Amino acid sequence: MAPQLLLCLILTFLWSLPEAESNVFLKSKVANRFLQRTKRSNSLFEEIRPGNIERECIEEKCSKEEAREVFEDNEKTETFWNVYVDGDQCSSNPCHYRGTCKDGIGSYTCTCLPNYEGKNCEKVLYQSCRVDNGNCWHFCKRVQSETQCSCAESYRLGVDGHSCVAEGDFSCGRNIKARNKREASLPDFVQSQKATLLKKSDNPSPDIRIVNGMDCKLGECPWQAVLINEKGEVFCGGTILSPIHVLTAAHCINQTKSVSVIVGEIDISRKETRRLLSVDKIYVHTKFVPPNYYYVHQNFDRVAYDYDIAIIRMKTPIQFSENVVPACLPTADFANEVLMKQDSGIVSGFGRIQFKQPTSNTLKVITVPYVDRHTCMLSSDFRITQNMFCAGYDTLPQDACQGDSGGPHITAYRDTHFITGIISWGEGCARKGKYGVYTKVSKFIPWIKKIMSLK
């Protein structure tokens, strides 16, 4: 009997196994209800404490509504939430030209300053020539509601409507042998230098003016001309404007009986190699010489060196090369609004390297900062007219000097060099509190063009 009872128990156990298995393994939806991780609930004291962003959103993951409860301000909540969700899209400063970046979820928005547009404020709206010169490489003028670019002589406008392309190897203003590593730049301290007006001179010196300059290597000042008197001596400088025209100062012409010109030289001590070019005519103000020989420019004031400008016409054309290139003639607006608002200009010459010392045999060059008109006028006992401007250093001993008169004051813009001034006069050379005074070429553009058009 016992064996039969044991067999019945075993059969009953085996019969019940499938039912037991089905009760242990639950369906996924039912199981998930039991296996979910419950969020820690705040304690009674946490619920009554003010919202804390670190507790709510850093230690734990929070919702936007929880963040809003902390900030209690919709704008602050949006700013935080945009960064919290996917990081700060503005961290790389994507907005150009000082645009303001606002972060978003998966994006950002740039708010641009006036005259700029684009997703990153990268597009400049050149509606005015006063904004980066209308993006023009040379000259800019406003035509209706747009800007229109044009170029100096011997250049053509590029296909982009902004750039200027040289049409020849010796187009004006091209420094073919660029200064590269020897760039004549302003010393760092000059940028913060303030003008101090010191002791004034008793007399102006008309025959200025390169003190403490560096050597200008061959081809680095290709527009430089040198005026030679009947004794074969250097007495003034000049600027090549065309194959037959050299710009100089009017007061230079009254210093000698005859004038010859040298170009393309950096060392005039080697007289056997230099070539003197003959002069055909000189156009200067009538108060210097008989009117039947010179072109008349009205109102020249010899005492104040006002209208200190003259043009020499050559008998035979100057042969251009990489060492002999004319400076470009700017428009008046371009000179006043762009060139003369640059930090500095370049002055060169063979004048005296120290006050009352011999002239230099080698061509010297310096960079001189522009001086604002008010400071310029206060620094001098003599009249600074509208036809003049100042350039130079208040305390640094660098300046033009005797023998440099008539030479070029050049300003570079986008790798093109324009004539902006004529070395005219000064009170000594590189004197503390004094500046070099230059003829303002922009005032004479129509006169220069008229003279150059004469046959």
Swiss-Prot record:
The UniProt record lists the EC number as 3.4.21.6
Lineage, top-rank taxon, reads Eukaryota
- Set out the biological process GO terms recorded for this chain's protein: blood coagulation; induction of blood coagulation in another organism; proteolysis; venom-mediated blood coagulation
Keyword annotations: Blood coagulation cascade activating toxin, Calcium, Cleavage on pair of basic residues, Disulfide bond, EGF-like domain, Gamma-carboxyglutamic acid, Glycoprotein, Hemostasis impairing toxin, Hydrolase, Protease, Prothrombin activator, Repeat, Secreted, Serine protease, Sialic acid, Signal, Toxin
All copies of the Gla domain together span 41-86
- Per the UniProt entry, the signal peptide is 1-20
What regulation of activity is recorded for this protein? Activated by calcium and phospholipids.
**Residues of the propeptide:** 21-40, 182-209
Q: Which parts of the sequence belong to the EGF-like domain?
A: 86-122, 129-164
User: What's the further remark here?
Assistant: Is classified in the group D of snake venom prothrombin activators, since it requires the mammalian factor Va for maximal activity for the cleavage of prothrombin.
This chain belongs to which protein, by name? Answer: Venom prothrombin activator trocarin-D
- List the source organism: Tropidechis carinatus (Australian rough-scaled snake)
